[in-house]
């Protein structure tokens, strides 16, 4: 059934996948809270002490959605697909890799924690890195492994098709972050949605060019670590919802910085690689 839905109604399939993912995260968060506070209060301590541990558990629940969709549609092999390989794929994604590495360095060395902030216990720092990895794994499995790949198969590997798939998958990636309206200020969430839509286009372009999902999981994890590193290492710093609420219109400049390399990655001379990595027969247009 899922295979037929994906083949015959790909846009409905993608929208449904995103909606199911968000619903699973929301319901999972509520059920986990009820379980910890109602049925197993003895286990609630670590989750109350470290928000990132709770976030990791919720992301693990959300991860079940793309895994189930990939399994039922016979496409769990996306995790094993080598494509261009991890290192060569990272070269394709060198722009965000360098950008994020610099961002991480600046946040660690120049921004730093508030004065007097205490370093968290090792298990809490480990929970932070686990949460960042699970966010990257769950969202990339959904938005690239399920959504972006489905859209590419639908629109095809010609220039117009690749750009349509890239734009729609980016828009869905941005829309998926609207769920933060439940805990953050609307203006900050709107700006986040715009920026992540542009980032989603960049990640889709890298995925189409490399055919390797783990490159995107790595970059996504690095992105979240760079943005939240001080919150992960120190007490008394901003939570995820507070960080999102602090977003202002000046951050829209980063959306442009994410979009510019998309034009380079999807230039005409490189589109044959997209068809090659994905086993699509339709030859792209000449540059």
Question: Where are the regions that the model predicts?
Answer:
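Aromatic-anchored segments of alpha-helical transmembrane domains
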Residues: 22-29, 98-106, 170-179, 221-232
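C-terminal membrane module of polytopic membrane proteins
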Residues: 221-287
């Amino acid at each position: 059934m899922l295979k037929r839905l994906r083949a015959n109604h790909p846009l409905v399939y993608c929208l449904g996948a995103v909606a199911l993912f968000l619903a699973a995260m929301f319901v999972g968060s509520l059920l986990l809270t009820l379980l910890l506070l109602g049925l197993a209060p003895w286990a609630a301590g670590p989750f109350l002490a470290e928000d990132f541990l709770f976030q990791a558990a919720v992301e693990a629940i959300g991860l079940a959605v793309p895994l189930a969709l990939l399994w039922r549609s016979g496409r769990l092999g996306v995790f094993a697909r080598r494509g261009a390989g991890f290192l060569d794929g990272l070269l394709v994604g060198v722009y965000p890799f360098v950008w994020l590495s610099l961002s991480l360095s600046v946040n660690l060395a120049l921004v730093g924690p508030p004065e007097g902030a205490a370093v968290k216990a090792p298990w809490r720092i480990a929970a932070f890195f686990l949460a960042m990895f699970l966010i990257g794994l769950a969202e990339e499995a959904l938005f690239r492994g399920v959504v972006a790949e489905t859209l590419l198969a639908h629109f095809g590997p010609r220039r117009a098709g690749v750009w349509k798939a890239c734009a729609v998958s980016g828009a869905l990636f941005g829309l998926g972050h609207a769920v933060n309206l439940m805990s953050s200020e609307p203006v900050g969430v709107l700006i986040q949605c715009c920026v992540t839509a542009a980032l989603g286009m960049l990640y889709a372009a890298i995925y189409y060019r490399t055919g390797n999902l783990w490159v995107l999981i790595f970059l996504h994890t690095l992105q979240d670590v760079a943005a939240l590193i001080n919150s992960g290492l120190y007490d008394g710093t901003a939570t995820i919802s507070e960080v999102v609420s602090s977003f202002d219109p000046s951050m829209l400049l980063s959306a442009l910085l994410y979009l510019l390399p998309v034009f380079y990655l999807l230039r005409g001379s490189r589109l044959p690689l997209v068809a090659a990595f994905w086993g699509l027969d339709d030859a792209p247009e000449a540059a």
